[in-house]
UniProtKB/Swiss-Prot annotation:
Residues 512-594 form a coiled coil. It comes from Komagataella phaffii (strain GS115 / ATCC 20864). One of its GO terms (molecular function) is mannosyltransferase activity. Residues 517-564 are annotated as: Disordered. It holds the Pfam family BMT. Keywords: Cell wall biogenesis/degradation, Coiled coil, Glycoprotein, Glycosyltransferase, Membrane, Signal-anchor, Transferase, Transmembrane, Transmembrane helix. Its EC number is 2.4.1.-. One of its GO terms (biological process) is cell wall organization. InterPro entries: BMT1 (IPR021988). This is Beta-mannosyltransferase 3. It comes from the Eukaryota. Belongs to the BMT family. Residues 1-6 are cytoplasmic. Residues 517-558 have a biased composition (Basic and acidic residues).
Length: 594
């Protein structure tokens, strides 16, 4: 019996070994047992079944870093580049909050949230009062023909989305037309072990959180999904920020849903980290998928190299504050390489990203957030922005943050890019489409499709004056290593200054074209009315105080007069008593004398 068991064990082990070797040796960078691996997708996100809508023209003004040592001092006009993109109508990415709520309440960590809902409300009313969602980030998984999206779901006991008890990250999948696939599952290979796993959606990401009914702003915020090329398949990493266990520090984390939900916290000893860490911009080097890189900050421009195993980060590149990008740049989408392999200089890479600007006291509102286009370049261990555009709004009337529903009716105008979902060349003619997810007014998650971005970049040109050795075009950007230290940095600083000046001009124009002048007139009219009202209130207050004072003085005088009268009466009576006593004394004397 023991011999038969040993034989059985040996046979099983041999079979497993054969399977393992078959997996390893059948992997040819294109598939494993017919399951395609990243970079060799058999599916397009934009096949004939996909409806993208009618594309409209979108003019984009950009500014290009100039690299010529002998070029004159250049103005923004010399560095400008004007081109045309095509953009689709926006498509709001909806979700079934009833289904999501049920999944969340099934989770042990969040089951007690049900006790904080208003008991007398119906299920629909509970969802409307307590549950909110915004800020979704996604990537297209060509191996599975779906969009993988992670959104922030907010629970508020008091019914205010901006005062949540906790936030929860929920992963969803959508078909190519952005229809949510509820109750569906994916069979995925663990990107590191090759083991088959089953994932049901929507899926509450299992991230430890410490909350109670009296807590505020707990849980995970600002999800960013970036696709890593794992050994056995795609590895969508979800980056987010949350409070640490002591609830005093907010740090950046990554969870890998396809790799047994492995979670790491990023940290560094190279400089003092802030109390709140957020807005790191992730990207991968094409030849290094085992670590993740971040643009930690734009001012100073600081690039980190971080371990995906333990979260330890080192500074790879840093510019001093004087040469950093503007502090008005606040984060960006995860950066993506160009959509097709093209000849490029050795030790050089290029990424596209959409940073966002935060401009205060401009045009339509007190604060305006808008995307801009950025071409980010690595040459060896040097990093810089080759191109920055002005503000981009995709031709949208941005949802007002608050107010009466008009574009200029609230204190904030918020359009924030979340992620580049996909970018691919769709045909033999070289036409390309990029899908970008974004949020408006912290209320919604939508997607737009941009056609012709690769063409826009490929036709790029810059300063071509007589001092230039040759034209500063896209081919030169790709083929040459032209980072030359201070000169490039100074030009790069000029470029971002031009782009931000253009963004401020856009902001002002946005207000003018959307009734900002009338709004300001009405605001001034309201200010004068309010000022008049306050003056009238002040006048009435002074009159009332004067009247009160006069009444008090009159009353005091009357009381003093009354007191004086009373004293006189008392003195009179006292005198009369004294006279009476004297009279009585005299009478006593007379009686004794007799």
């Amino acid at each position: 019996m023991r011999i038969r068991s040993n034989v059985l064990l040996l046979s099983t082990a041999g079979a497993l070994a054969l399977v393992w070797f078959a997996v390893v040796f059948s992997w040819d960078d294109k598939s494993i047992f017919g399951i395609p691996t990243p970079g060799h997708a058999v599916a397009s996100a934009y096949d004939s079944s996909v409806t993208l809508g009618t594309f409209n023209d979108m003019e984009v003004d950009s500014y290009v870093t100039n690299i010529y040592d002998n070029a004159p001092v250049l103005g923004c006009y010399d560095l400008s580049y004007h081109g045309l993109l095509k953009v689709s109508p926006k498509h709001e990415i909806l979700c079934d909050m009833k289904f999501i709520r049920a999944r969340v309440l099934e989770t042990e960590a969040y089951a007690a949230l049900k006790d904080l809902e208003h008991k007398k409300l119906t299920e629909e009313e509970k969802i409307e009062k307590h549950w909110f969602t915004f800020y979704g980030s996604s990537v297209f998984l060509p191996d599975h023909d779906v969009h993988y999206l992670v959104r922030r779901v907010v629970f508020s006991g008091e019914g205010k989305a901006n005062r949540p008890i906790t936030s929860i990250l929920v992963a969803q999948i959508y078909d190519k037309n952005w229809n949510e696939l509820n109750g569906h599952f994916l069979n995925v290979l663990n990107p590191n072990t090759g083991k088959l796993q089953h994932h049901a959606f929507p899926q509450v990401l299992p991230i430890a959180v410490n909350w109670d009914r009296n807590s505020k702003y707990r849980g995970q915020e600002d999800p960013r999904v970036v696709l890593r090329r794992g050994r056995f398949g795609p590895d969508p990493l979800v980056m987010f920020n949350t409070l640490t266990q002591n609830n005093k520090l907010r740090r950046l984390f990554t969870i890998s849903p396809f790799d047994q939900y492995k979670t790491v916290m990023y940290r560094t000893n190279a400089f003092k980290m802030q109390t709140t860490e957020k807005n790191w911009v992730p990207f991968f080097l094409k030849d290094d998928q085992e670590s993740v890189h971040f643009v930690y900050s734009f001012n100073p421009l600081r690039v980190l190299n971080c371990s995906l195993d333990n979260g330890a980060c080192d500074v790879l590149f840093e510019l001093p504050h004087d040469f950093g990008m503007s502090s008005e740049l606040r984060g960006a989408t995860p950066m993506l390489n160009l959509p097709q392999a093209i000849p490029m200089a050795d030790d050089k890479e290029i990424w596209v990203s959409f940073p966002r600007t935060r401009i205060s006291d401009c045009g339509c509102s007190e604060t305006m957030y808008r995307p801009m286009l950025m071409l980010f370049v690595r040459e060896g261990t040097n990093f810089f922005a080759e191109l920055l555009s002005s503000s981009i709004d995709f031709g949208l009337e941005v949802i007002p943050y608050t107010g009466d529903g008009l574009p200029c009716s609230s204190g904030q105008s918020v359009l924030i890019p979340n992620s580049i979902d996909n970018w691919e060349v769709t045909g033999s003619n070289g036409e390309d489409i990029l899908s970008l997810t974004f949020s408006e007014a912290d209320k919604s998650t939508s997607v737009v499709h941009i056609r012709g971005l690769y063409k826009y970049l490929s036709e790029l040109d810059g300063y071509g004056g007589p001092e230039a050795e040759d034209e500063h075009n896209f081919q030169r950007i790709l083929s040459d290593l032209h980072f030359d230290g201070k000169k490039t940095i100074e030009n790069f600083k000029k470029v971002q200054s031009c782009a931000l000046d253009a963004a401020k001009a856009y902001c002002k124009e946005y207000g003018v074209t959307r009734g900002e002048e009338d709004r300001l007139k009405n605001k001034e009219k309201e200010r004068k009315i309010e000022e008049k009202r306050k003056k009238e209130e002040e006048r009435k207050k002074k009159e009332e105080e004067k009247k009160k004072k006069e009444e008090e003085e009159k009353k005091k005088k009357e009381e003093e007069e009354e007191e004086e009268k009373r004293l006189k009466e008392l003195k009179k009576k006292l005198k009369e008593l004294q006279e009476e006593l004297e009279k009585q004394k005299d009478e006593v004397k007379d009686t004794k004398a007799k």
